[in-house]
């Protein structure tokens, strides 16, 4: 599964940040991306396991992959509309 994470066009390091900072940074980064581009998010805040999937659903982005069995957590999202 790690191979899918290496395909990301953008990367966001949110290690050490706590809610709501990771999602705020994701939102800011995604705004600068083109539709269809991908973003790898690396985080260690347990709240991201809930917040990032919810953000994707709410904002019509696709959560392509996630690895949350151990820290650091990894999320790969694809920008939607």
Swiss-Prot record:
Q: Which Gene3D superfamilies match?
A: TusA-like domain (3.30.110.40)
| Protein biosynthesis is among the record's keywords | no
Q: Tell me what this protein is called.
A: Sulfur carrier protein TusA
Q: Where is the active site?
A: 19 (cysteine persulfide intermediate)
Q: Which terms in the GO cellular component ontology are assigned?
A: cytoplasm
Q: Which gene encodes it?
A: tusA
Query: What organism is the protein native to?
Result: Shewanella sp. (strain ANA-3)
The family classification in the record reads:
Belongs to the sulfur carrier protein TusA family.
Q: State the protein's purpose.
A: Sulfur carrier protein which probably makes part of a sulfur-relay system.
Gene Ontology molecular function, alphabetical:
sulfur carrier activity
In which domain of life is the source organism classified?
Bacteria
Record Pfam families: TusA (PF01206)
Q: Could you list this entry's UniProt keywords, alphabetically sorted.
A: Cytoplasm
């Amino acid at each position: 599964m790690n191979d899918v994470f290496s395909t990301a066009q953008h990367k966001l390091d949110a290690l050490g940040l706590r809610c709501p900072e990771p999602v705020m940074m994701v939102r800011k980064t995604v705004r600068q991306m083109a539709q269809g581009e991908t973003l790898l998010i690396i985080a260690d805040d347990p709240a991201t396991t809930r917040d990032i999937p919810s953000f994707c659903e709410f904002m019509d982005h696709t959560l392509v992959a996630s690895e949350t069995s151990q820290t650091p957590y990894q999320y790969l999202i694809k920008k939607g509309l």
